[in-house]
Amino acid sequence: MGKFDGVLIASDFDNTMVYTEGALRSGGPVPAISRENRDAIEYFMAQGGTFSVATGRALPSFASVMDGVPMNGPTVLFNGAAIYDFPAGRYLRTAFLPECIRDHVRQLSQLMPGLTYEIYHDDNSISIELHIIVENGVNLPAVCRSIMNE
């Protein structure tokens, strides 16, 4: 029996396990996981622990940056809307929004023109709409991603 048998740790990826803010802002490559984090995760798993990542990213977005991240548990994607088994290449559980969400969001957008939203599709396809977000009294241009215009 290992020291961590029966223990599950699920870590966020962006800016928790790996500092990605700079890469996301610049469009550059996401840095690799630090040696210290990798060693700690590998030790935890070697001692019987189950390690997973829980991220807000969609499947294609996380798959593109997960190389080098040691995991022996399923991955939580879409801010908890899906659990994915990378070795098996399949979803274990999903709670995706129904297709009618497009109509509902379109109606809300007509009723509330300033509404800002972000909706990811399973294949990571998105269209772009420009909105203005007010943060601390300052108008900031923001890109709002949606699947509305498919």
Give the residues covered by each predicted segment:
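Solvent-exposed alpha-helices and their adjacent loops that cap or buttress functional pockets
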Residues: 1-2, 69
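Glycine-rich phosphate-binding loop signature in dinucleotide/nucleotide-binding domains
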Residues: 2-3, 111
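A short, polar/charged loop-to-alpha-helix boundary motif
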Residues: 25-36
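Acidic, His- and aromatic-enriched active-site or binding-groove loops in soluble protein domains
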Residues: 133-150
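Asp-based phosphoryl-transfer active-site loop
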Residues: 5-27, 53
